[in-house]
A protein has these predicted regions:
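Active-site cavity-forming subdomains of large catalytic enzyme subunits
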Residues: 1-221, 225, 234-248, 263-270
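Core structural elements
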Residues: 231, 235-237, 242-290
Length: 290
């Protein structure tokens, strides 16, 4: 319980400074698991999805709510409840939700064979295991995404295979979730800066027989964009320094400010060491039409 509420507190502190965040919930015990407190058994994932969602909605950023991504491994025994959570109108309205699919699950869905869920998900000796129909659960994911636009899917084994930072997992760069809109997978306390290049703007003589894409200009601008993004990291670090100065100068007792101060110190260190950036594209459809 302590870790769950620590995440909630850190989320609120981040969002009050106009930040967004992604949480992976795969560490939470499945519903019905024994716990050593007065509740005796765990309530599972869904109540905590609601808690994090409500925190996002409650902390306004200049009148706008924060941004939150919740994810869970398909290996988790409560993943089906997670997948169904937003099918009820009014539930988990403050978060995007995505399910992390592994190669084993996708192969089982194709072959029509059972798939084993367990908790803890990466344990060699799990305390809980169950078999499910992978094909049926995959069809439910597709149906729910069609019906409510969620959950999103993260092909997690592919993400990890192609993730350069995971070469440094032993140094704290093990990828655990994504930013709120899912563009970039990140490790705990890491942050991202994203820039999109408008492809339509590189179409010369659009909507004519002489239309062509200016690859040379595009190549030049991609290099400049990445250069700019690296500079933005340093600007962000300066901003975090000012945030920490503001926290230090606030009149509250140090024990009240400690969680937020430690949080921003972790983000500052991870941002400076990892220097994560993302350069993407937009207006691909307009480019093709032109």
């Amino acid at each position: 319980y302590g870790a769950i509420f620590k995440v909630d507190e850190e989320q609120v502190q981040l969002m009050k400074r106009r930040g967004g965040v992604g949480h992976d919930l795969s560490h939470i015990r499945p519903k019905g698991s024994p716990v050593k407190n007065s509740a005796l058994t765990s309530t599972g994932l869904v109540p905590f999805m609601e808690r994090y969602s409500n925190s996002t909605r409650e902390v306004a950023q200049d009148g706008r709510r924060g941004a939150l991504m919740l994810s869970v491994s398909i290996k988790h025994p409560d993943s089906e409840s997670f997948i169904d959570a937003k099918m009820t109108e009014g539930k988990v309205t403050g978060a995007n939700v995505s399910v992390k699919l592994d190669d084993e699950f996708m192969q089982a869905a194709v072959d029509g064979t059972p798939y084993v869920q367990q908790y803890p998900i990466n344990s060699a000796n799990p305390t809980f295991k169950k078999e499910i129909d992978a094909s049926a659960l995959w069809k439910k994911i597709v149906h729910n995404a069609w019906k409510s636009a969620e959950p999103g899917v993260l092909f997690w084994d592919t993400i990890i295979r192609e993730s350069v930072p995971d070469c440094y997992a032993d140094l704290g760069y093990r990828t655990v979730s994504t930013n709120p809109c899912g563009e970039i997978p990140l490790c705990p306390y890491d942050s991202c800066r994203l820039l999109a290049i408008n492809l339509y703007s590189y179409v010369v003589n659009p909507f004519t027989p002489e239309a062509y894409f200016d690859f040379e200009l595009f190549k030049k601008h991609v290099g400049l964009a990445q250069r700019i993004m690296d500079d933005i990291i340093d600007l962000e670090l300066e901003k975090i320094e000012r945030i920490m100065e503001k926290i230090d100068s606030d009149p509250e007792d140090d024990n009240v400010k400690q969680t937020e101060r430690v949080l921003w110190d972790k983000i500052y260190k991870k941002s400076g060491q990892g220097r994560r950036t993302g350069v993407g594209i937009t207006a691909e459809g307009d480019m093709l039409a032109a």
